[in-house]
Curated annotation (Swiss-Prot):
The gene is cga. GO terms for cellular component: extracellular space; follicle-stimulating hormone complex. PANTHER family: GLYCOPROTEIN HORMONE ALPHA CHAIN, GLYCOPROTEIN HORMONES ALPHA CHAIN. Heterodimer. Glycoprotein hormones are heterodimers composed of a common alpha chain described here and a unique beta chain which confers their biological specificity to the different hormones. InterPro entries: Cystine-knot_cytokine (IPR029034), Glyco_hormone (IPR000476). Belongs to the glycoprotein hormones subunit alpha family. Shared alpha chain of heterodimeric glycoprotein hormones. These hormones bind specific receptors on target cells that in turn activate downstream signaling pathways. Involved in gametogenesis and steroidogenesis. SUPFAM superfamilies: Cystine-knot cytokines. The keyword ATP-binding does not apply. This is Glycoprotein hormones alpha chain. GO terms for molecular function: follicle-stimulating hormone activity. The keyword Oxidoreductase does not apply. Its main location: secreted. Keywords: Disulfide bond, Glycoprotein, Hormone, Secreted.
Amino acid sequence: YPNNEISRGGCDECRLKDNKFFSKPSAPIFQCVGCCFSRAYPTPLRSKKTMLVPKDITSEATCCVAREVTKLDNMKLENHTDCHCSTCYYHKS
């Protein structure tokens, strides 16, 4: 996907950033932040005909997410040591 200044609309690129709210001086917490890609466009007529609930606008997006996700005692632990643009969590179902 495009990841240039024009498509981000002035938003910083996807990267790790120190989370000041959760971090402690001896234990910094890092979080993936920034923009990747999103766009919206009119839904093509042939696509609307196949939709259960037709919609006029179609959107595509990728979000800035942690590259690594591991399990710890059946609890999801997101290791934010590296970030990349991927499917937005709220689009996964």
